[in-house]
Amino acid sequence: QARRREVKQLRETAAVVRHGDAVLVARRRPGEWWEGLWDFPRVTGAAARRGRRLGLVAYSVTHHRIECTVREQVVPRRTKPAAGQRWVKITGLESLAMTAPGRRIAAIAAAPERP
């Protein structure tokens, strides 16, 4: 009988970097889960605590259970994106090949603001 592998718990923070009606998305790099698909950038350190908390997305991938805090970070001007990143209108996200967690984050980002 095969032993079940232990599920590893991970926490991460996704940044919904917003300028006007556009958000910054990043293409998953070779060797990452969902290589080549678009997603919201993950941030660490001080950046992971910056901005308004929009919600939480939980998902599982290959013996990993991940809790992803979603934070909004509004920037005053649209900066040039890094390699593998681009600005997309929030309404244009549905046309991108996105990860499943990325789609859930997009739905949170597109939801009307709550008081």
Predicted regions and their residues:
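Intrinsically disordered, low-complexity, charged terminal extensions of DNA damage-control enzymes
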Residues: 1-115
